[in-house]
């Protein structure tokens, strides 16, 4: 982890943004190396947002493994700093519906929304985010024709997704699960799919994919790395 490596990683992603590619596949990058090089980005998604977004586009993180798909409403942010608003939730999920229509040819995708708090807040006893933010967002989205559930307890919501994944079902209950923060969505999909999980950046004019895992410096030079993640990332844009 050095400033030189961070600078090389940054310039590589920036160059990919500049050449007019229809899709970009990136390898994992060490965020601390970006910081050492003076580039204060929390990840490659944020770099893509800076150099490719226009007309108020939002780059979002969609994770997929075959029929199991998860959208994150927030990206690389500390739990104490999560700041969801009704307007932001509505915008991100409308973008997601547009992406499903354009790229997956699903006109009316079914979305399952995770509750923010344990047991989806228990009617406000365990937290007010569902009442103050998520339920009003769902009401607005339904007015716009979005097929979305109310906030559901996240600890049980993903059980069905895991079963469908292992049974390799092509017909699923929900086309995408919507998580409020990073670990809420990534723990379930990575637990069942492992290295087959792909990170897909949506919301921009191009699609970017990368393996769902990190740099794995702990196994560097040991000849035990598994290329599955990179292969799946490449296949996802073809």
Language-model regions: role of each:
Residues 1-238:
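Anion-binding alpha/beta catalytic cores of soluble intermediary-metabolism enzymes, centered on
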């Amino acid at each position: 982890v050095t400033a030189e490596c961070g600078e090389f990683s940054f310039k590589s992603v920036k160059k990919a943004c500049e050449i007019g590619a229809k899709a970009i596949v990136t390898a994992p990058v060490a965020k601390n190396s970006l910081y050492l090089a003076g580039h204060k980005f929390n990840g490659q998604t944020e770099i893509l947002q800076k150099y490719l977004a226009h007309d108020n586009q939002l780059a979002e993180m969609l994770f997929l493994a075959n029929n199991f798909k998860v959208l994150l409403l927030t990206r690389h942010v500390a739990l104490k700093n999560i700041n969801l608003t009704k307007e932001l939730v509505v915008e991100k999920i409308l973008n997601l519906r547009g992406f499903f229509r354009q790229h997956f040819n699903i006109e009316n995708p079914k979305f399952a929304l995770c509750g923010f708090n344990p047991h989806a807040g228990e009617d406000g006893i365990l937290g007010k985010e569902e009442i103050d933010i998520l339920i009003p967002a769902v009401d607005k989205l339904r007015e716009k024709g979005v097929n979305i559930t109310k906030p559901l307890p996240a600890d049980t919501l993903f059980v069905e997704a895991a079963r469908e994944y292992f049974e390799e079902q092509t017909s699923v209950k929900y086309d995408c699960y919507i998580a409020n923060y990073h670990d809420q969505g990534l723990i379930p999909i990575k637990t069942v799919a492992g290295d087959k999980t792909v990170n897909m950046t949506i919301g921009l004019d191009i699609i970017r994919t990368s393996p769902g895992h990190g740099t794995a410096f702990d196994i560097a030079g040991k000849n035990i790395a598994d290329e599955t993640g990179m292969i799946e990332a490449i296949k996802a844009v073809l």
